[in-house]
Amino acid sequence: MSPQTETKASAGFKAGVKDYKLTYYTPDYETKDTDILAAFRVTPQPGVPPEEAGAAVAAESSTGTWTTVWTDGLTSLDRYKGRCYHIESVVGEEDQFIAYVAYPLDLFEEGSVTNMFTSIVGNVFGFKALRALRLEDLRIPPAYSKTFQGPPHGIQVERDKLNKYGRPLLGCTIKPKLGLSAKNYGRAVYECLRGGLDFTKDDENVNSQPFMRWRDRFLFCAEAIYKAQAETGEIKGHYLNATAGTCEEMIKRAVFARELGVPIVMHDYLAGGFTANTSLAFYCRDNGLLLHIHRAMHAVIDRQKNHGMHFRVLAKALRMSGGDHIHAGTVVGKLEGEREMTLGFVDLLRDDFIEKDRSRGIFFTQDWVSMPGVLPVASGGIHVWHMPALTEIFGDDSVLQFGGGTLGHPWGNAPGAVANRVALEACVQARNEGRDLAREGNEIIREACKWSPELAAAC
């Protein structure tokens, strides 16, 4: 062996599996204001110490690989590596830990959720040293969030566009979700809008199938919107689903919606992908379209408690990528959603500044600086008896979306919409008069039933 080879070997370039904690576990590290911070729920394999597991997460989601490579000497690992800077046990779980990891800002491309997730929730989730791994929360520093456009318009601009203030907005998903012709679909939209709803919605499954091509649906829905607006004197909208198999086709559908003069389009942001979603958000801001976001596929990612990613992370990513509405659970309907946790990520969607609050699952203080907020959409198995609770829980800056709760009315779509609007107006008025919606909600609805036969029939 030559002296030169011996020197290289002694300098630390010997092949072999290495301990990650020697390089990537840094409990003395003081986080920087520009760091992206992550909280991972780590379940190590038996025999793997938590410090090694946390360091492995930091390494494999940043600069690390399983062995020392000679090109490590060509860059500054201290500048670019992720660092596991704190580990704590999960209460009630012997084998689970929260590992806090700090990432230098230079690891990520500006304005790209796709690039951020490729590192932070990439191959590390298949790492053999871990039985399970879940990303619980992210802290996005202003230095990074300012590289994103964010929502096309935001809450205040949407209210100004619609000229609707002081109450939640009302919506309805048209059912059956699949099988209607475009003309019958448009008729259902018209009946709901003329009855008092602000919005109707394409189901996320509706794209451009043989029974109803997208262009036909857009035309009949636009006709329904204009007719309902003329009759009610209110601005109406229908979430026209622009989701498509290619970005080019998606933008083509959004262009047609703009040409029809409708106010809003829709996108399935997880199924469609963050790159497509960000492209559509840019188009919507440039062309005055609101953007409704559906979260189809989220439960594949966020439902398991020890593996995947919490929805609060997906919600933060959506605010960065761009959307004016996003479905956020109901707390009271058919779909899963714990109240305090749900309100935690609802605040992350709407507010400018959110303090750390572990009781609500918020691991980091988040400052969105000037990024517009996103309206949370409550939908899934809700009806008029839920209206007091929904009004109290979600407040004015929300969209309450009743599918079966509107279309299932015994008298039809329009009376179902009337029932929802009357229930909402009654709850808002009662709240403004100082009544307790949580305690008096049922009584408020019963009182409103006396002067609204449509609401009485719905109850």
Swiss-Prot record:
The gene is rbcL. Substrate binds at N123, T173, K177, R295, H327, S379. The record marks K334 as: Transition state stabilizer. The disulfide bond which can form in the large chain dimeric partners within the hexadecamer appears to be associated with oxidative stress and protein turnover. Pfam families: RuBisCO_large, RuBisCO_large_N. Gene3D superfamilies: Ribulose bisphosphate carboxylase, large subunit, C-terminal domain, RuBisCO large subunit, N-terminal domain. It is an enzyme of class 4 (lyase). This is Ribulose bisphosphate carboxylase large chain. The modification N6-carboxylysine is found at K201. GO terms for cellular component: chloroplast. One of its GO terms (biological process) is photorespiration. Keywords: Acetylation, Calvin cycle, Carbon dioxide fixation, Chloroplast, Disulfide bond, Lyase, Magnesium, Metal-binding, Methylation, Monooxygenase, Oxidoreductase, Photorespiration, Photosynthesis, Plastid. It catalyses: 2 (2R)-3-phosphoglycerate + 2 H(+) = D-ribulose 1,5-bisphosphate + CO2 + H2O; D-ribulose 1,5-bisphosphate + O2 = 2-phosphoglycolate + (2R)-3-phosphoglycerate + 2 H(+). Mg(2+) binds at K201, D203, E204.
